[in-house]
Every structure is written in structure tokens, then in C-alpha cells.
Amino acid sequence: MCIRDRPKVDPQGKIQSFEALSRWFVGGQAIAPDCFVLMAERHGLMTMFSRLVLQQSVAILQQWQRQGLLYPIAINLGGPELLDDSFFAELMSLSADHPWLTQYLQLEITETNIAVQQPLLHKRLRALNQYGFSISIDDFGTGHSSLSQLVDCPADTIKIDRRFVSCIPQDSRTVRILHTTIQLAKALNLNIVAEGVESDIQRRFLQSLGCQLMQGYLFGRPAPADYWQDQLLPKSPKLELGAKKA
């Protein structure tokens, strides 16, 4: 298993941060993420799996920091990992041993996990936030969270699911939902990320709504950390729209 980083960019194409995505290659062939993640969930391996992602992401951040590159990386976590005592302790140890890392390590948890009425999960999210970790609600709009849970969750970012973005601009009802969601996020002082942006029409429309960050194939495919390091060191971190990287 290895990490491929996907950039999060502002509407002008300037890289602001990254998301760590897991990739698994067997005999030179890529295994679909949906497949191996489902297998890990079925066999109770998600905590071990997420620990590998965490460790590799921390190594990337440390490598970049030595090169003078300070770009946050988000990792995806589920409820089981955060409820695992040893995994939670590892996160807390990171904040104690390397305080600067918490400024550059964002924790993404899906709205479905946030919606679960699990007091210990919410308590641990609040503790992580108090120790400096940024919390992001992933796949926003696809779960079943109430507005009260959104207020109670210590998140500072919401990610609009690609299913909404893919409907821009042809579905007027979805467009109204997007507009309302972005206005709600602004009212709650939350940052906004739209995922699945694949066309300049979508980019410009989201920009007109005030969306702050975007990610998707329009800005480039997920790539190894060394690739982004080479891209970011010699010049200003700005991508050509439509850049591709396998």
C-alpha cells in the first residue's frame, strides 16, 4: 500500500493543501480502493490500515518540512479507528511529541460517522480539536446528520460530496442546495471544500458561490509526494487547469 496525494486548490488553481489517498498495487496492477477498503472493513483491519496511512502521511509532512514546504495533508478516518484506544493514543502522542504536526494534519470523518450517536466519538473529536487537529466532515450532504449535530461537532471544514458537484450547472434544484449549503457553512464560520470538480464551468460556478477550496481531475490526478515536492519547490504552487498525473 502507498499514498497518493490529491491537491486541494483555490479557485485560481493555487495549491493550498492535500488529501492522502490509499493505493494498493499487486503485481503492477492497481486494486480498486472501494474493493480493498471493503475487505479491510469486513476483516476488522481498518485501524491497522488507517495507522499505515497516518504514519506515511506524517513521514511526508516531515520530508516536506525539511524542504521548507508547509502544506497540510488530510487523512480519512472512520468511527472505529477513532474509538480504538491505541489509535487515539497515537494521535495524542503526535500532538505532544511534534506539536507543529497538528497544524498540518487534518482529520476527515464522514458525515455518516458524525451522525452516529456515539458520545465517546464526539468526546474524542473535541479532544483532538483542542490539541490542534483540524476536523473536516467528509461527504457532506449524503449522511443523516441533523443541524444540531453539525453545530456540536468540532469541525472547521465541510466537504461537499461530488454527487452534488457533478450536477452543476444543469440541475437547478441541486444548485439551490449547493448555494444554501455554502451559505450555511459561512454562517457557521466553516471552511468549504468541493470535491469532484472536473470542468471549468463547475470551477467558475463554485467560485461564484464563494467556495474556497476545490479538488478534482480538473486540477490534476493524485500523485506521489515526490512528484508534488518537485512541482512545488522550483516555482509558485499553481497548477495548470486540466493537468494530468497518473
Predicted regions and their residues:
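Active-site core of bacterial EAL-family cyclic-dinucleotide phosphodiesterase domains
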Residues: 1-39, 76, 137, 220-223, ...
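Conserved functional hotspot residues or short segments at active or partner-binding sites
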Residues: 124
